[in-house]
């Protein structure tokens, strides 16, 4: 929807670019909403995780997607600075009762800093952290 600010997670990008992914259709259905957002944000950690995960299934698509993100003026890819990593490591260390990965914690830190609430993801970790997941997926997925 116009005016929205959306965080883009690996979960969504993988589902979108891997036709064999069980959430591919859901990701494709969400894509117009992402495209019409006023701002889309992700991180270098998400970009790296995405390319690594898609290297076997859609290397060319992953490369093209990343290049398109960098070329789009509405898209911001936040670098993983030492300060951001320190904040994320603190979240990671303090979340022993969760299964959050470091990339999740980097995402959560960026979302909090930028005042983002919506995430293009089906990852239940985002809901656990208090954000809105734009894709419905059972907690045990991925």
Regions found by a protein language model. Name each.
Residues 1-42, 55-66, 140-142:
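Short, well-structured N-terminal submotif of metal-dependent ribonuclease cores
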Residues 44-46, 104, 123-124:
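Short secondary-structure boundary segments
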């Amino acid at each position: 929807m116009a005016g929205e600010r959306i965080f883009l997670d690996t979960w969504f990008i993988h589902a979108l670019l891997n036709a064999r992914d069980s959430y591919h259709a859901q990701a494709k259905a969400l894509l117009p909403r992402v495209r019409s957002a006023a701002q889309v944000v992700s991180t270098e950690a998400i970009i790296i995780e995405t390319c690594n995960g898609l290297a076997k299934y859609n290397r060319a698509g992953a490369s093209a997607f990343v290049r398109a993100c960098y070329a789009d003026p509405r898209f911001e890819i936040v670098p993983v600075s030492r300060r951001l990593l320190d904040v994320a490591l603190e979240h990671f260390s303090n979340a022993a009762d969760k299964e959050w990965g470091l990339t999740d914690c980097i995402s959560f830190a960026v979302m909090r800093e930028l005042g983002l609430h919506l995430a293009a993801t089906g990852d239940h970790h985002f809901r656990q952290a208090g954000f809105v997941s734009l894709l419905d997926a059972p907690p045990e997925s991925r």
